[in-house]
Amino acid sequence: MTPFAEGIWVDIGPARILGMRLTTTMTVLRLDDGSLLLHSPLTLTAERRAAVEALGPVAHLYAPSRYHDLRIGEWAAAFPSARLHAPSGLVKERIDLRIDRVIGSVPEPAFLSVIDELLIEGFRLEETVLIYRPTRTLVVADLVHNVGRPQDLVDQVVYPANGIL
């Protein structure tokens, strides 16, 4: 985990989408009670789990959009007492998950003093952005993405074909 700001850590992992080599970011936020919220969790590895557990107890798993749920089941199995928050579209798509709260339905009491949630309506992915009030940090998933420069011939073809660069 890389410290980002007071109470915020990030970890970056590889992702391949539509043939493009991208990165994806997991953000860890500390709540008032010292527990953690994992936003868009990456693949669960022993090293990553140990790094997260060193920061505090995992209390919340957060799928910020319909595309950021791929690894959340691994974390839910590892931390069965953690509450799982997900967009409404995942309720039908991921019947294998125990979704404790549909984002936007009711406020999460544990977030009220430190996190504001804003559901971006009209966006097919049903993305929710978070504002971490203690540091005034905006946490996003797909609304903002730094793809970087194409690394090889495949990227040079695939990026423009997908409207990037």
Predicted regions and their residues:
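Short, hydrophobic/aromatic-rich segments at coil-to-beta transitions
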Residues: 5-11, 37, 112-117
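Active-site metal-binding motif and surrounding structural segment of the metallo-beta-lactamase
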Residues: 43-87
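Zn-dependent metallo-beta-lactamase
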Residues: 1-32
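Glycine-rich phosphate-binding "P-loop"
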Residues: 10-14, 31-44, 101-105
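Active-site environment of divalent metal-dependent phosphoester hydrolases
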Residues: 18, 45-46, 67-71, 91-94, ...
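Divalent metal-coordination and catalytic microenvironments
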Residues: 29, 65, 84, 130, ...
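Metallo-beta-lactamase
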Residues: 2, 6, 16, 37-38, 86-127, 133, ...
